[in-house]
Amino acid sequence: MDTFQVIILALIQGLTEFLPISSSAHLILPAQLLGWEDQGLSFDVAVNTGSLFAVVIYFRNELWAMFKAWIASMVKGQHSDDSKLAWWIILATLPAVFFGFMAKDFIETHLRSAGVIAVTTVVFGLLLWWADKMSRRDLTVYQTGWRKALLIGFAQALALIPGTSRSGATMTAALMLGLSRDAAARFSFLMSVPVSLGAAILVGKDLAESPLPIDYQALTLGTVISFVAAYLCIHYFLKIISRMGMTPFVIYRLILGAVLCGFIFL
């Protein structure tokens, strides 16, 4: 990839990773418009790592409090709201880990297509709208509970299908289960940390063993740009949903799905 392509794709990834609009749907548009080839798994991991750094730094105080409380719960048997939240995040991670191992090759081979992404972009956009309009939305992140956490975890596993949007699927599930918009977003952001970290480690291992050359300069640039874009995105997204809800993102998903369908069928 040339530098321009790296910048554009990293910006897209960083700006869309934590919005409920599907980063994979946006990453396929440059390929359709400009004839770019698939950026490959190594670049996906690089820009996802940049996004991971962004959420860790943005929520550093919450994550540190959760980590200390989690350790205390195991060493001293002391349980607090933060330790419970940490355990719920771990529990919510398990479905994605399991299905990621089981279905990784199938997804890469059969579901990474424009048609699948177009359909899931629209369908899960409508589900997000329904959840935002019809649900209670009055629970805080500390009222999630292990049952709700596990169900949100299964939604995250479903988001392994390209176009679904990890943040979109998890926020939809959280809203359906009664979490407030802010709580749904924060739980979704926090549960992205272990999944993204695990995926980066696993794929990084595969890349290290691969005989193919790796463009480390492009990967580093992509990571930095994705980090900056994702950090700003998290900050402003939390402000937007408190004022306007999810409707702007639902409308955007429907338009994006229609555009993708246009590229496919016209």
Curated annotation (Swiss-Prot):
Gene: uppP
Catalysed conversion reaction: di-trans,octa-cis-undecaprenyl diphosphate + H2O = di-trans,octa-cis-undecaprenyl phosphate + phosphate + H(+)
One Pfam family recorded for the sequence: BacA
Family: Belongs to the UppP family.
InterPro entries named among the record's database cross-references: UppP (IPR003824)
Keyword Lipoprotein: no
Protein name in UniProt: Undecaprenyl-diphosphatase
Annotated function: Catalyzes the dephosphorylation of undecaprenyl diphosphate (UPP). Confers resistance to bacitracin.
Any one GO molecular-function label of the UniProt entry: undecaprenyl-diphosphatase activity
Species in which this protein is naturally found: Shewanella sp. (strain ANA-3)
Localisation per UniProt entry: Cell inner membrane
